[in-house]
């Protein structure tokens, strides 16, 4: 009996430590975000006097007004929504269609293909060769430059391959016995069992396409810019918002508010999306890492 009590006591102590670490990690992540929200909603006077903490002082929506009233803001936001949705859909289709045959060990050349995938993870072509390739395909200046070249990510591909490997082979054999054709197994049997991995990989792709601004800077014209590139130009001061005749002090403090509002505006959609996919996220990662 004493040993049971000691085990129980040590288990409780361990749980307390784990919860304390988790709460501390949560605070590290959430406090800066709350502070950014507070800065974006505070008045210039409160910012000048360094009165802003976690609660806004002198509620002021001028920063958001400056961003939302800019002529090209909603066009850029619409571009990003298109890139995120279309890019994620195309990437998932390409990744699944490549990962499923790679998960079959009886496929001729399967090991060579996997080695090529892993090799390309560590030794990429580089910026200039990629630009020359995309330019030779006449994709520069088109929205496809943000979608087609990034349709498959090696890390996401490996997750899907390992997930498909973890599925029992007997399921496919039973489906064939029941009369389901080879071309129907993937959409009718495998994909319904792979929602966790698809949601995980889909979230990775969505975050990538949502945050991608560098490729837009290289390949797109101004009207096709994603919102991240639009907001980056605001933060860097290459795009002027508001009345240029305003006082310098107000301009500097408003700039702080605008930069904070930019952070909130750009990250909020992903933060809102994540809780809906959280239940699939951990499962998809753990199951996708069972086999190598």
Region roles according to the model:
Residues 2-292:
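A hydrophobic, multi-pass inner-membrane permease signature
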């Amino acid at each position: 009996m004493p040993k049971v009590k000691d085990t129980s006591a040590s288990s409780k102590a361990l749980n307390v430590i784990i919860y304390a670490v988790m709460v501390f990690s949560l605070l590290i992540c959430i406090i800066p975000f709350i502070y950014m929200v507070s800065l974006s909603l505070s008045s210039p006077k409160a910012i000048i006097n360094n009165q802003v903490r976690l609660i806004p002082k002198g509620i002021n929506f001028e920063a958001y007004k400056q961003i939302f009233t800019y002529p090209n803001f909603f066009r850029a936001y619409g571009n990003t929504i298109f890139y995120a949705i279309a890019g994620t859909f195309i990437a998932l289709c390409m990744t699944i269609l490549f990962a499923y045959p790679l998960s079959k060990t009886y496929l001729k050349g399967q090991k060579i293909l996997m080695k090529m995938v892993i090799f390309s993870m560590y030794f990429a072509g580089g910026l200039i060769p990629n630009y020359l390739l995309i330019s030779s395909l006449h994709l520069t200046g088109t929205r496809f430059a943000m979608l087609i070249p990034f349709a498959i990510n090696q890390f996401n591909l490996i997750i899907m391959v390992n997930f498909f490997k973890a599925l029992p082979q007997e399921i496919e054999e039973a489906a064939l016995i029941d009369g389901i054709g080879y071309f129907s197994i993937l959409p009718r049997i495998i994909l319904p069992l792979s929602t966790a991995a698809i949601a995980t990989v889909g979230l990775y792709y969505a975050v990538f396409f949502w945050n991608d601004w560098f490729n837009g800077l290289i390949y797109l014209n101004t009207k096709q810019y994603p919102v991240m590139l639009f907001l980056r130009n605001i933060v860097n001061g290459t795009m002027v918002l508001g009345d240029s005749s305003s006082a310098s002090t107000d301009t500097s403090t408003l700039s702080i508010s605008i930069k904070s509002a930019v952070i909130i505006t750009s990250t909020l959609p992903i933060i809102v999306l994540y809780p809906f996919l959280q239940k699939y996220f951990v499962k998809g990662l753990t199951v996708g890492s069972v086999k190598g």
